[in-house]
């Protein structure tokens, strides 16, 4: 992901950026560009909406039930992707945030 601003250089956001609680990271991702190179083609879009999920006490968070095979990525190192399939038709992308061992992630809700 790269910041999207006319007066800021376009750089890859370092993993250290994600080493904070999800509610702090989520609004700062809005306006960033998500880029992927796929089969030699550059695919990109601007992040327009995010949602923060923070810890087992967050009842909307997958980790509310604790550590399971499905939620294990949320407990991992910040800056990694947590991707899952839902409703039998959608793949959802999240950026893992906070310290390793703390289940937190930001859902990329709009691109």
Predicted feature locations:
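A cross-family signal for N-terminal binding/gating loops and helix N-caps
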Residues: 2-111
